[in-house]
């Protein structure tokens, strides 16, 4: 590890292979917590490259719990977090809208690191069992159409690092790679990131991971979601080509809304917002979910255009299908799935 730390101190990039080996060291028991913290801080100060991100993703996926990966066509819409905006749980709420529209959603997530309420905190508050095993997740994807993959369960080697990340209380490379380490063999992906200069590198990693189609977004105000506040910077991966775009919410019929107006709170407050949105209540929260779910449906290939994606997202909510998916997940995730274990 000393060689890698020395390179980072000198501002040098690590190669993909060096980062892969460093990643295996980070996940081992043969390293001091102070070394892990130093590595994360130095890497953040230098700035992460696509090669470094992919190298660490390789290490994490290698050490993750094994999946059969017989489920075809799955999607994740997990974002990086780390934007400091304290918004409600946009991507987690949107996940049920996607599922209600017929997308198989393998939602990867964690507890809060730099926000008040992470996806795991919200789902637990709503009554979802967040500790499903790989076999149970396969079952849920096949029979319910949505499953939650709790990062500490999927990546047991990350437990030490999670503690250090919490103590550092700043975004690190683990924010960036969270959405990229889903152990399910995803076909498509919608990724919100908090760093605009990482749009292309993250898209390049998704390309290396073999995604059929993907959309990476950095929202107005550097949100890790699409925002109603103004122009959103987007990179589309389609047909193995990467294209930069911008998305203006007003073009799709939305009024501009400041990011401060979609702030969330603790898990109880955010659960209330999620239930209101999925129940069809009109609000700025709903509009934010419609924009994000609409973009994700376009990224999935479920619709040909973003406009159609937004309409399909609205139908998923207003038909009751999105809320039904939540209720089905609550029930099925809490069953004793002995038949699949």
UniProtKB/Swiss-Prot annotation:
EC number of the protein: 2.4.2.18
A cellular component term, taken from the record's GO annotations: cytosol
Cofactor note: Binds 2 magnesium ions per monomer.
Classification via SUPFAM superfamilies: Nucleoside phosphorylase/phosphoribosyltransferase catalytic domain, Nucleoside phosphorylase/phosphoribosyltransferase N-terminal domain
Pfam families given in the database record: Glycos_trans_3N, Glycos_transf_3
UniProt binding sites for anthranilate 1: 79, 110
Catalytic activity: N-(5-phospho-beta-D-ribosyl)anthranilate + diphosphate = 5-phospho-alpha-D-ribose 1-diphosphate + anthranilate
An example Gene Ontology molecular-function term: magnesium ion binding
Superkingdom, natural source: Bacteria
Chain sites annotated for binding Mg(2+) 2: 224-225
Uppermost EC category: transferase
Residues binding anthranilate 2: 165
GO terms under biological process: L-tryptophan biosynthetic process
Amino acids binding Mg(2+) 1: 91, 225
Annotated binding of 5-phospho-alpha-D-ribose 1-diphosphate, by residue: 79, 82-83, 87, 89-92, 107-115, 119
Keyword list, A-Z: Amino-acid biosynthesis, Aromatic amino acid biosynthesis, Glycosyltransferase, Magnesium, Metal-binding, Transferase, Tryptophan biosynthesis
Pathway(s) per entry: Amino-acid biosynthesis; L-tryptophan biosynthesis; L-tryptophan from chorismate: step 2/5
InterPro entries: Anthranilate_Pribosyl_Tfrase (IPR005940), Glycosyl_Trfase_fam3 (IPR000312), Glycosyl_Trfase_fam3_N_dom (IPR017459), Glycosyl_Trfase_fam3_N_dom_sf (IPR036320), Nuc_phospho_transferase (IPR035902)
Required co-factors: Mg(2+)
Subunit-structure text: Homodimer.
Family in the record: Belongs to the anthranilate phosphoribosyltransferase family.
Function, as annotated: Catalyzes the transfer of the phosphoribosyl group of 5-phosphorylribose-1-pyrophosphate (PRPP) to anthranilate to yield N-(5'-phosphoribosyl)-anthranilate (PRA).
Alphabetical list of NCBIfam families matching this protein: trpD
Name the UniProt record assigns to this protein: Anthranilate phosphoribosyltransferase
Taxonomic source organism: Bacillus cereus (strain B4264)
């Amino acid at each position: 590890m000393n060689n890698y730390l020395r390179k980072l101190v000198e501002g040098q990039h690590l190669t993909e292979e060096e980062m892969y080996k460093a990643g295996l060291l980070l996940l081992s028991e043969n390293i001091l917590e102070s070394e892990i913290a130093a590595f994360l801080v130095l890497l953040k100060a230098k700035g992460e490259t696509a090669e470094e991100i992919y190298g660490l993703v390789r290490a994490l996926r290698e050490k993750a719990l094994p999946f059969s990966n017989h489920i075809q066509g799955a999607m994740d819409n997990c974002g990086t977090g780390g934007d400091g905006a304290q918004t409600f749980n946009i991507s987690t709420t949107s996940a049920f809208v996607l599922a209600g529209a017929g997308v198989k959603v393998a939602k990867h997530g964690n507890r809060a690191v730099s926000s008040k309420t992470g996806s795991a905190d919200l789902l637990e508050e709503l009554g979802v069992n967040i500790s499903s095993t790989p076999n149970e997740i396969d079952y849920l994807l096949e029979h319910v159409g949505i499953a939650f993959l709790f990062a500490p369960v999927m990546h047991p080697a990350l437990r030490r690092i999670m503690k250090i990340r919490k103590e550092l209380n700043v975004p690190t490379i683990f924010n960036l790679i969270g959405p990229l380490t889903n152990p399910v063999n995803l076909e498509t992906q919608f990724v919100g990131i908090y760093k605009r200069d990482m749009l292309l590198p993250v898209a390049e990693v998704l390309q290396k991971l073999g995604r059929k189609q993907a959309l990476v977004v950095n929202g107005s105000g550097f949100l890790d979601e699409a925002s109603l506040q103004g122009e959103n910077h987007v990179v589309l991966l389609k047909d193995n080509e990467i294209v930069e775009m911008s998305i203006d919410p007003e073009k799709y019929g939305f009024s501009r809304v400041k990011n401060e107006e979609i702030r969330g709170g603790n898990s109880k407050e955010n659960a209330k917002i999620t239930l209101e949105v999925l129940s069809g209540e009109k609000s700025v929260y709903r509009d934010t979910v419609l924009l994000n779910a609409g973009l994700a449906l376009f990224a999935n290939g479920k619709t040909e255009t973003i406009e159609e994606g937004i309409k399909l997202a609205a139908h998923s909510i207003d038909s009751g299908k999105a809320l039904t998916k939540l209720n089905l997940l609550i029930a099925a995730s809490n069953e004793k799935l002995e038949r699949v274990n």
